[in-house]
Amino acid sequence: SESAAEKLARVRAAMQEKGAAHHLISSLDDIARLTNLRGNDVSYNPVFLAHLLIGASNATLYVDDSRLTAPAREALAAAGISVAPYEKAADDIARLSDSLLVDPAKVAASTLQSLKGTVPVIESVNPSTLFKSVKSPADVAHTREAMIEDGVALCHFFADFEARLARGEVLTELDIDRMLLEFRSQRPNFVSPSFGTIAGFNANAALPHYSCLLYTSDAADERCSVE
């Protein structure tokens, strides 16, 4: 897979093409992918709260320093990325004088407004966002592996689900949620679900993105909708 240093080199080449001296990235998925780091600050997403400011020869990750592990610090240092407190980002950005590349769709409106009139702003899609649209062989292989592992977990779940119903057990939507998590968590490299389980029966099955709670969980049969 591509190293963080190699990814930064591609971003800097794109910055040069656009005439940008600096590039601010606030979208968490872009930052995680560029740095090859993962976190759990947002439910169901392997991202962490941060800003990334990239220059022609330097880069700074604004993040809660206490959250970084020793291997993460070493990886950042190897890629030439320094670390600064998350709250320091606004001050450092305000001190910029050269052109700054930002994606207006992926930066806070307040940040964009504060830059107007203080620094030449180049508005364009984050280069890293475009890079993500082209999957590497490793990306494709890992996606296939994840789908296979999830398929195995689902096969185990459906077999257990049907066997329990055949024995006359009464299963609620909440039971199904717990069963799915149990089988998925047994697969290699499991981290977390990608979204909350949607297990709905009767009227609940008609609710988009329904999430069962203890007091709403209905008894289910083979007609239960599961996502």
Model-derived regions, located:
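Terminal domain-start leader segments
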Residues: 1-173, 178, 185-192
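Flexible, glycine/threonine-enriched loop-and-boundary segments that flank and lead into catalytic domains
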Residues: 181, 198-214
